[in-house]
């Protein structure tokens, strides 16, 4: 399994992300040619070159706006020096115009630009997902409807390039899973249209809800709303554990000189593909006062609401009473309904809950032709080789009844086939 890991020890911004992914292996020409499909090429140029921060070499990306003769990162210098007079993504209002004349595009404008392009559907969808993260945050912060939001910085062409460029690069890398570390957001304060605001800015905080962060490593905004949205729209899990083999490292160089390297580090890794690991939960309870006939009914209901496995263990409880430990394996999605069944249908008044990692072999299902008809077979692979398989019991049972034959004959008919 191919892994992309973001090490955000100094945060993340749109340009640093683009630079890091180019440094990781996305060809410059491919990125530039794909971005031209947005039909915004007359508004900007991209400068991609090697750079260094505190001795670390990586790639630096500048999006140069043709109609302004300066780039986005000069604007960020103003913002980060607390002289900027607008929010990162401001609601359009009656305040004086931006000192740098950006196009203040709405979400609908951006959707039209992306949807009318010739980019592939996956890139379009991913780009829109990232923009939606920003739009939802801005709408929440400013108390507006989603499509009333007008962007300043993120609606400018340089930020559109950062976001759509991120989608292009992720699509090119063909990774199976994206992970990230805790996100460093920085500290201090920034002057915005509404006054002096703490770092991270309100929109950034909204985007980073439910995402683990670190603060205060420098008195500077290290994670921008664009960078936060790229993570929020793509990362499957935020973890400090690197449970994969690192194949390549790359660095996106930032534009500030800090006491720590102003870089975004990314890893391209390989996770052993013969197995998959899922985080699941065990819910269990000890019961010694329930009619044993009811267990079968309870088990049926548990499976119906999404339990992955149900098992019962004989136990000896206090005062020598025999009992049953009812254990249910479930995922987070079905946990609430599983608990409802346990509390409503058993005599339990308390449940133990703990998280487990389930390690699974890679599996697939296929049809096997037999003398009794087609039967579904589950195959399991280890290190790329088929190591075990078995027919689906319910199908074998139905065929045995329909054909009036022993179920053992149905199983044998499957195992006679050469499935390797």
Curated annotation (Swiss-Prot):
Coiled coil: none annotated. It comes from the Bacteria. Disulfide bonds: none annotated. GO terms for biological process: protein maturation. It is an enzyme of class 4 (lyase). Residues 81-104 are annotated as: Disordered. This is Pyridinium-3,5-bisthiocarboxylic acid mononucleotide nickel insertion protein. It comes from Clostridium acetobutylicum (strain ATCC 824 / DSM 792 / JCM 1419 / IAM 19013 / LMG 5710 / NBRC 13948 / NRRL B-527 / VKM B-1787 / 2291 / W). The lineage of its organism: Bacteria, Bacillati, Bacillota, Clostridia, Eubacteriales. The gene is larC.
